[in-house]
Structures are given as structure tokens and as C-alpha cells.
Amino acid sequence: SNIDLKPLAPVFLSIALFAIVERASSEKEFDRGELLSYPFNEGSNFGGVSLSIDNRLLVVAASNPTPDNPQNIDLFTTTYIVNGKNDAGDFSYYWGGLNLLGPEINTPMGWEAQPALSAEGDELFFASARENSTLDDDGNPTMDIYVSKKDENGDWSHAEKLPPPISSSAQEKAPFIHPDGKTLYFSSTRLPSGGGYDLWVSRRDSMNVWSEPVNLGMPVNTTGDEHGLVVSSNGNEAFFASRRSGTKGLDILSFPLPKALKPEAVKVIHGVVDPTPPSDDIILTL
């Protein structure tokens, strides 16, 4: 299908969000999906999304026109709210209204999009082109990757541009921070490149210093554009958007991630917490 948005990281390879939601069968084949209901698709143009690993916090890019910037794109958040149990005894949920992130992240004359939440939901990476952005070799404002951190009160810090070697004179966009909290995948026009946007990976150490980015190489990168790479929580499978020979516009592709490009191994416990007080002690064994 001609989907022109980056995929959202499917934590358990069961759900992927594009412009629509698509669910995988046991054979990992996706159906045609369904449009998301309120607060999505309510008149604004919606772009990239990112979902926390507990599926409770979602960040989405959406149009937010202003008199001085009718093309303004900003970042919003929404939370998944427990709505009690339904007649079948199952918990039901709904997405709350969209909340515009503040001036620490959004800028009135800039472009903030392509969010990437950390697994803990305490770091937000995103791409932005701003009034003070430098120009690339073609005279276009450069997109850079920024990060904001949530404090103990739940407030987001002033977003800072990632330092070199992540930032460069080229275009950087479409970040994805793996649940290991260390491995960052992103798209860039930097050299060496096969052409257009290529996919890159960098890792940060205990001192919060990023390693020199590594190009994912052929056959993932081509002379066309590749971006929006996301990696499953187990680190085995990657999904990305590509405009290349044989595709119809910008399509979503997947591939098994080679060992050299994998993030650190993480263990994710998936379940539903029942707020009903237990009648006895609960023992959890890993």
C-alpha cells in the first residue's frame, strides 16, 4: 500500500500504526486496518506518532496553523484512559483529548514532527526545522534531531539539539530510540551515502556520549530515500519506509536485523494490571 508515514514501533509485533491501524494475524500478515477514532482524524493533518512501551502515552505530530505560519506542525500528547469494565468483564479504554506540548518543545515558526518516545516515556526525541536552522548545500533549512526530558513532576525540559556526531551540516530526521535506551536509529543525507536519505545507527555510553553513526549499508539503503526505521523490542526485526525501485511511492518494508546493527537485549513484561485488590499475595517470576 502507498503509506507515506513512518511506521510506529510494534513492541510485540502485534500492532503497527501508520495513517491507519493495522493488526497482525498469527502469521504476522496485516489486515487493511481501520481509521483511528477521536481524538485522531478530527480535521487536522496527522503525521508521525510514537507510543510508550506500556501503550499509555502517545505523541503525535499534527498541523497547528497560526496567522504567521499556516503550515505549522506541532507535537501533541494523548493518554490511554481506563474506562472501567464492560459487560463482558473486560477493561475498556479510550484515548483522551490531544494536549499541545509547550514552548519547551514546539516553536511558532518551526516544524516539529516525527516523535520518538523512550521506553520509559521520560525522553522525547523528535525532528525539527527552525528559524535559526542552518542551510544545507541546496539552500534548504536543515532538519535536526532534538531531545526533551521529563522531570519528576512530569514537565518536559527545554528541547536541546543532539550534539555532533548526530548533528551535522546535512539533514537528520526520523529518530527512533530503542527500548534499550542506548541505540538511536535515524535518517540522514550525510556522507557516505548511497543517495538521498540513508538509515544510520549510533549508540550512547554511560556518559551520554553518542558514538560515530554507522550507515546501515546495502541492501537496506539504496539510491532512493530510506527513513523512519523502527526496531521491535526483541531487536530481531526492523521496519522502515522507502522510496526505491519496485515500490509504489513510499512503502513500508521489513527485514531481520543483522547482529552488528542490533540494540542491546531487553526483556519486556507485557500484561494488564487489574486494579481490583488481590485476595492473596502475587508472585512474579522472571
Where are these regions (language model features)?
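Short, conserved micro-motifs composed of acidic
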Residues: S1-V272, P277-I283
